[in-house]
Design a protein with these regions (language model features):
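Sec-dependent bacterial lipoprotein signal peptides
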Residues: 1-10
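Beta-sheet ligand-binding and adhesion/scaffold domains
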Residues: 77-119
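Short, hydrophobic/aromatic-rich segments at coil-to-beta transitions
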Residues: 20-22, 51-56, 76-81, 100-103
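Solvent-exposed strand-loop boundary residues in beta-sheet-rich modules
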Residues: 29, 54, 61, 75, ...
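N-terminal helix-cap/turn-to-beta initiation motif at the start of protein domains
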Residues: 11-24
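N-terminal glycine/threonine-rich, aromatic-flanked beta-hairpin/loop signature
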Residues: 35-76
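Short, solvent-exposed loop/turn elements at domain surfaces
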Residues: 30-34
């Protein structure tokens, strides 16, 4: 049993493998009509890059930030990540895995930024 657990630990989390790569913001969902244009502009400047256990987040008008992340929980296609910042603080973020080419970065319970895998 222990050897099986060690083998699984060495393989990495299956969700982590699905996230691997660079994701680019494309659009937004469930924003008020008056916010859609600005939110879409911001979303198109957003990128998430997953490399091993590292996550780099780039947002418009800010320097990219990199931290170590782990998959905190998975429920169907809902994934919660725990991301450790350079100062040691831990942030959580929620994603919805739509398919191998599309994820949604959740903002609250209903709003989302849709990201597509970089080709």
């Amino acid at each position: 049993m222990l050897s099986g657990l060690l083998l699984l630990a060495g393989c990495g989390n299956p969700v982590q493998r699905k996230l691997e790569g660079r994701w680019l913001g494309e659009s937004v969902e469930n924003f008020d009509a008056k916010e859609v244009a600005a939110a879409t502009g911001w979303a198109r400047g957003l990128s998430l890059e997953f490399a091993g256990s590292r996550l780099t987040v780039a947002v418009p008008a800010e320097e990219p930030r990199t931290g170590k992340y782990k998959v905190a929980s998975v429920r169907e296609n809902d994934v919660q990540l725990a991301v450790t910042r350079a100062d040691g603080a831990v942030d959580t973020t929620n994603l919805k895995l739509d398919d191998e080419r599309s994820i949604r970065f959740m903002i609250g319970d209903t709003r989302a930024v849709v990201l597509r895998r970089e080709q």
